[in-house]
Amino acid sequence: MAQKVEAQGGIGGDVWDDGAHDGVRKVHVGQGLDGVSFINVVYENGSQEVVGGEHGKKSLIGIETFEVDADDYIVAVQVTYDKIFGYDSDIITSITFSTFKGKTSPPYGLDTENKFVLKEKNGGKLVGFHGRAGEILYALGAYFTTTTTPLTPAKKLPAVGGDEGTAWDDGAFDGVKKVYIGQAQDGISAVKFVYDKGAEDIVGDEHGNDTLLGFEEFQLDYPSEYITAVEGTYDKIFGFETEVINMLRFKTNKKTSPPFGIEAGTAFELKEEGCKIVGFHGKVSAVLHQFGVHILPVTN
């Protein structure tokens, strides 16, 4: 049963209530000249996205969006409010979101002196919003559920290889569905991954350069299959100041991929017992120089 935390702020406008859901995926916030003019929340119920009502009025300043990762949830909302000339009561002037994993949004709106925080005393999960709105947002409250088994934030294992190129980081997801590896004459030229997030396919960016050799694909039997380790090698290649990744091999709970690339140089393995790989990061130029992973504990 969700706990309804009373709305605070002013008494203007009309009451609105999105109710309680399983979680929050996105919050769209619109700013006016005097404060927060608009809010619209995308919730999740099971694997379905539910778009809440549009509360307040959009302005020419536009809309900003705070997105919550699939393995994270909002635990607190800091709200500022003030009495502004032209309004009969206090209005909401800014909103700042904080999550379980320590992610904090910028303040959306104009940060003023009067503050309150919407949260559950045991660090519960925010699952809905309610409040008052007219031409602007007057009051804001929330629904929380007590989380008896908090989500574990993903752990980032350091990348290995040579310190050259531009850093990239796909972040952490629910799992990995497909791996694409592009090979060059001297090493791995490019990588790209298809992830799962909330039962949706998320196609990651392509990191590196295409070659005439094209991409090779390694597909997992997701969700029953997951990557448990990545083996590889890196070596110093003529034409590059530091080492390049010249081979990658992916191990799952069911099988092992063929080696992609040429096995030579220093060997490495990226893994942690009892964990699955849910994201990748590294450094790249014309070839892949570094490769690292994000991991989460395996749960039944």
Curated annotation (Swiss-Prot):
Q: Name one GO molecular function term.
A: carbohydrate binding
The chain's disulfide connectivity reads none
Domain of life of the source: Eukaryota
Q: What happens when the gene is disrupted?
A: Defects in female gametophyte development. Arrested during endosperm development.
Q: Which SUPFAM superfamilies match?
A: Mannose-binding lectins
Q: N-acetylalanine occurs at which residues?
A: A2
| Transmembrane region(s) | none
Every copy of the Jacalin-type lectin domain together lies at 2-146, 154-297
Q: Which GO terms describe its biological process?
A: embryo development ending in seed dormancy
Question: What are the protein's UniProt keywords?
Answer: Acetylation, Developmental protein, Lectin, Repeat
Q: What is the similarity comment for this entry? A: Belongs to the jacalin lectin family.
Tell me, in a sentence or two, what this protein's role is. Involved in gametophytic development.
Protein name (Swiss-Prot/TrEMBL): Jacalin-related lectin 32
- The gene designation is JAL32
